[in-house]
Structures are given as structure tokens and as C-alpha cells.
Design a protein with these regions (language model features):
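N-terminal maturation segment of proteins
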Residues: 3-290, 294
Length: 294
């Protein structure tokens, strides 16, 4: 009887040990599954941010070339668009895209990310939410200005366009040819601002028109001629004769594409003179929108 009692105790002990082992084994499996899930989340998040970067950096040629010296390292193809677009379709698409990106980002659980990824998450979410708020006022942006306007800044960007080889030169020439299309989107945007009483004041427009007129007058001493000649001189692998040929082509494109694009922009903007209803700046318009009616 005493032996049977001991045997029973041993059985119970073994059963308890077995239960504990099963529990510990199950816990280990659950923990392993959780760890795998966290690792998967981290990997997917890295893939998401990588795709986000590639998509946004390659929306147009001039942006991608400005930020990336070797886009092929990121396996990026040549963008279809030469310049950013300011037309109604692109503005609406951007608004929809921002909302979708926020929803994608929300799917990630921050606690399953590394500290560095959590910081990236917070910065990206803050950026997207700010962009979403700004998208409520798509025509409040001041795209034209005497020095800071896009019609002035694009000259500086083109004059600093990085030239390392013949591929860069040909891409640069395509940008010169496509400047008219870019200005068309600025004209369309300006007309939409007029409809909403958000266009430049007459004084500001006068300054913009003066800046454009100065560009048009520089037919022989245009900055795009001088800067191109300097940049191409430093390129290795192109002989002197070919460089001279490219310099002639650049000067020709400025005369046949760039200056006519500025002349067209001048003409359309001049026709909008007198439509600047708000002399106090866009800030006042925002105040009127944000303040409750009393």
C-alpha cells in the first residue's frame, strides 16, 4: 500500500511536470510567433518607407536629378514627367494619395517597431497630417514672386542642373524643351486663384512681370548660356568639338523654347492684372476662413 501510494504521487508529479513542460513549450511557441510577427512588421515597415521614398523622389525628372546623383543605385527608372504639375488633376490626386498614405501608415503597430522605426513613423505621420491639412487650401500657395516665385527659381535650378555625362546633357535639353508645359500648369493654377479671389495683388504681379521681362531681354547674355558653358567644360569623356556642338544646341533651345515660354507666361499673367482682390495677403483670407461667423 505504501509503495502504491508513492507510485501515485510520482505519477501525479510526472503529470504536473508534463503539464508544465507543455505550458512552457506552448509559451515558447507563442513568444516565438510574437517575435516572428515583430520581425515581419519591422521588415514590412522598412519596405514601406523604402517604397515611399522611391515613389516621392521619382515623381518628375528635375526633382529626382536634384536629390539623387545616382538614381540607378535605387533601381529608379526615368520619370515620365519632367516637372511637378500644378493642374487640377494632379492637385486632386495628391490629396487622395496623402489620405491613402496615412491609412497605410496607421496599419503598423508602433510597439512592434524598433526605436529608430518608431521615430521615422512619428515624423512621417506628422508630415502626412500636415500635408493633409494644407491640401484643404490647394490654391493658397504663392507660386509666383519676384525672387521666390517658381518662374524665377526654375532658372536657378536649371543653371545648377548637374552635368556629369551626355545622358545628363540630353535630360537637361528635354527640360528646356518642356519648360512651356510647366509654365502652362502655372498659368492654369493662377487662373484658378483668380476664380477664388486668391491671386496676387497688382503690385506683386507688377514685380513678377518685371522679372519675367528681364529674362526675356537677356537673349544673348542669358544665365543659362553662361552656366551651361562652364559646366560642360568640366565633363570628361566628351571631346572639344562635341562640347561646342552641345553649347550651340543649348543656346538654340534657349532662343526657341525657353524665351518663348517666358513670353507666353508674361502674356497670360499680364491678362490677369486687376484680379488681385486681396491687398492684405493670403493670411487675411485664412483668418476669414478659420474664424467662426459672429
Amino acid at each position: 500500500m505504501e509503495f502504491a501510494g508513492r507510485l501515485k504521487k510520482i505519477r501525479i508529479r510526472l503529470i504536473m511536470i508534463g503539464i508544465c513542460l507543455i505550458f512552457l513549450g506552448g509559451y515558447s511557441l507563442i513568444q516565438e510567433w510574437k517575435d516572428q510577427k515583430k520581425n515581419t512588421t519591422k521588415k514590412v515597415f522598412d519596405q514601406y518607407t523604402d517604397a515611399f521614398f522611391k515613389e516621392n523622389i521619382s515623381t518628375n525628372e528635375i526633382t529626382m536629378h536634384f536629390f539623387l546623383e545616382n538614381p540607378e543605385k535605387y533601381r529608379l527608372e526615368q520619370p515620365k514627367n519632367l516637372y511637378p504639375s500644378m493642374n487640377q488633376g494632379s492637385i486632386l490626386n495628391e490629396k487622395i494619395k496623402i489620405s491613402k498614405e496615412i491609412e497605410k501608415l496607421k496599419k503598423f503597430k508602433q510597439k512592434e517597431l524598433t526605436k529608430k522605426q518608431q521615430n521615422t513613423y512619428m515624423v512621417l505621420m506628422d508630415y502626412l497630417r500636415r500635408q493633409k491639412n494644407l491640401s484643404m487650401y490647394p490654391y493658397y500657395e504663392r507660386i509666383l514672386g519676384k525672387t521666390s516665385g517658381q518662374q524665377a527659381q526654375i532658372l536657378l535650378t536649371l543653371s545648377e542642373y548637374r552635368l556629369k555625362n551626355e545622358k545628363d546633357i540630353k535630360s537637361y535639353f528635354q527640360l528646356l524643351k518642356g519648360l512651356d508645359g510647366y509654365f502652362d500648369s502655372l498659368i492654369e493654377y493662377s487662373k484658378e486663384q483668380v476664380k477664388r479671389n486668391l491671386f496676387l495683388s497688382d503690385q506683386s504681379l507688377k514685380e513678377v512681370l518685371q522679372q519675367i521681362q528681364n529674362v526675356i531681354k537677356q537673349k544673348e547674355n542669358n544665365m543659362l548660356v553662361a552656366t551651361f558653358n562652364l559646366r560642360i567644360a568640366d565633363i570628361k569623356g566628351i571631346n572639344a568639338a562635341q562640347k561646342k556642338k552641345y553649347c550651340r544646341e543649348n543656346k538654340k533651345l534657349i532662343g526657341t523654347k525657353v524665351l518663348p515660354a517666358y513670353e507666353k507666361l508674361y502674356s497670360h499673367l499680364q491678362a490677369l492684372n486687376g484680379n488681385g482682390k486681396n491687398e492684405n495677403g493670403l493670411y487675411l483670407s485664412l483668418i476669414h476662413i478659420s474664424e467662426p461667423t459672429r
